[in-house]
Regions:
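Gly/Pro/Ser/Thr-rich low-complexity, intrinsically disordered segments predominantly at protein N-termini
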Residues: 1-175
Length: 175
């Protein structure tokens, strides 16, 4: 299935979908813990960007067209200012976000998450953060083949190249 075919699909139900290399994927409905983490991180990033206008923060309502047959909607994403100013607000965002954040759901598989990470980087992402609610950890990816570091509750989440000055203690995400 192509991106164009995906866009023409009627949504007869309350399910959310992504397009994964031509395959329609039903997205699992998030649970409260997932939503709390997403809201917390979105709030922290938005507050930072409001005080430091370096780009724009998006939620999972926004699709990124990563290839002609792949559309993803990361839980949280960030585009640097120069890219954010160029997007057409009426269409999906071409390419990957500069920063993609995925919060793992209980039925997500490691292989499916690794596939998403590879897709983000192939389309131009600079950083991917993968949040693991059960272990209260965050993986920081700067390349598609391996996580650079795994952060735990007392560690600081930072992205100096994209968000100079942003710093968030990992434990803050988990309440």
């Amino acid at each position: 299935m192509s991106v164009e075919e995906f866009d023409r699909l009627a949504e007869p139900d309350e399910l959310s979908y992504e397009l994964d290399e031509g395959e329609l994927v039903v997205m699992t409905k998030p649970r409260p813990l997932h939503n709390r983490i997403v809201i917390s991180l979105t709030f922290e990033l938005q507050a930072f960007v409001k005080s430091n206008p370096v780009g724009e923060v998006f939620n999972s309502d926004n699709f990124y067209v990563l290839s002609p047959n792949t559309k993803r909607a990361p839980d949280v994403s960030f585009l640097r200012d120069e890219r954010a100013k160029q997007i057409d607000p009426d269409v999906d965002i071409p390419g990957a976000p500069d920063l993609a954040v995925e919060v793992l759901l209980p039925n997500d598989t490691v292989s499916a998450m690794r596939r998403k990470i590879r897709q983000y980087f192939a389309a131009g992402a600079q950083i991917v953060w993968v949040v693991y609610p059960e272990t209260r950890e965050v993986e920081v990816w700067r390349e598609p083949t391996r996580a650079e570091i795994i952060l735990q509750e007392a560690d600081l989440l930072e992205a100096p190249d994209l968000l100079p000055g942003f710093s968030l203690r990992i434990g803050t995400l988990f309440g």
